[in-house]
Amino acid sequence: MKQISLFLTVSVILILTSCRTRTTNNALKRGEKLKSSINSFEKNRKKLSSKVVSSLEEAKESLTAENPDLPEVSKDFEKQWRSIMKRYNKMKGDFEDIGTNSRKYFGELDELSSNIHNEKLRTEELAKNKALKGKWEKIYKEAEVSVNKVTTVLESGNDFHMVLVASSIRQKLEQNVTELTNIAEQAKALLSELEVFTQQGRQLVEG
């Protein structure tokens, strides 16, 4: 009877240890996934920012040249803008992944803290998790506003292409150049703002 009791006790300890180890591993994996999605977002943000600025500057230079070939400029711009939208969709997908992975990350973190036996310590750790989650959600929502603004700016780029095509028939340039400058400035500013989100996200997962 004593042997059975001892066996059951050891079995329970092993099961609990296994569960805790699995929870710890899951939390670590979630942290790595979140970090990876943040890094991917930053990579695509940088590439998008560079691509937007260079493409718009190139288009502006072509438009302000003497006797510009508008049909040719329009074709080149369309090609560049397709590449920009492709990169933007990657960045936006990464941003959505960050949201998903961060929710799972905090879920694993709470589960890990919930396994603390000492009630006072457990309560303190869960409170820390809650405070960190609140801070993160604020940062994420602010970044979401910027991402949506980037969407609006890039839609302006799509509209600009349509105007450019029409202008290639009408041969009107002055307004186009001004509009192009505005789009470039807005895109550059918004994409720079998102760098702050990346930095804060990295601080979250790296401690």
Q: Which role does the model predict for each range below?
A:
Residues 69-82, 126-138, 178-185:
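Short, glycine/alanine-rich amphipathic alpha-helical segment
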Residues 2-9:
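Sec-dependent signal peptide recognition
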Residues 48-58, 65, 189-207:
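Long, hydrophobic alpha-helical segments that serve as membrane-spanning/inserting helices
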Residues 98-179, 190-199, 203:
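Extended amphipathic alpha-helical interaction segments
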Residues 20-86, 93:
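Immediate post-signal-peptide N-terminus of mature secreted/exported proteins
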